[in-house]
Amino acid sequence: MEATCPPILLQMIYMIMAGYFEDDASDELTKDSVFKAVLEKSALASQPTVSRFFNRMDEDTLKQFQEISQILRKRIYSIQMPQAVILDLDSTLLAAYGKQEGRAFNFHYRSNGYHPLVCYDGITGDLIKIQLRDGAAYSCTGVTDFLQPILDEYLNDYPTIHLLLRGDSGFATPDLYKQCEENGTSYVIWLMENFIKESKSGFDFSAVSSHNRIVNANRVQVHALAYNIFNWFRRLVLSAKMRKQRIDTVRLKLLKIATKVVHSARYITFKLCSSCPYKEEFYDPLSAIGKLNVQLE
């Protein structure tokens, strides 16, 4: 089957959001009626096609993922501009069990894997940036280079947003303090919101199964993109009650439910079971999506 890159990327984002994290799941879903209808394809890209898609990725695609993140953030902010953003700096261990490039023993976590830097918005939970690092890296290794593009983006594109940087003691370095002061950013070294748990368990950021380090870095970006799209969906269109629920609960109520796909001459209709207990939760977001005013340019 011939497949170009954008449809495969979209397929992987939908799969990750639905809880299918591995390339192999593509073969199981290839004839799934809902996936085929949403992607407008007669069949999904197969596991070998998906794996080749990832293996073609390089440093340039990493930069493109950052550009995609910035473009989407601008569109989300056109709907709901924040008054303040808390830049939550953190690091975590992505466990790796093979012979991946950059896999190493981390003495803090006492395990092998990668040790990425992450930056979330501590108010909304948006993942602003994630960067894969070798497993043996210290928490603060490369933090100023990691942070500067974020500060540049907010200071140039969103000058009215008040920035506060927050991190734990692992980031207590004079270089970071100086960087914040030179960029007019308040900072505090303290405990922070923990959004990493849902990122790792709900979106499997640890799916770093390729041997090549750059390929794994790109894989993480795809999972990060899926996380952010879900987080924006949760924040902008779910009800206040549903907004507090984690991805596993939302999957159970809105995604992993029985439906009948009906094809007509002009439309594809998804019919819910008459006894579906979450009909209201399902239809409310559809109505809210129709009311969004997104600035596309």
Predicted feature locations:
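Anion-binding and metal-coordination hotspots
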Residues: 1-297
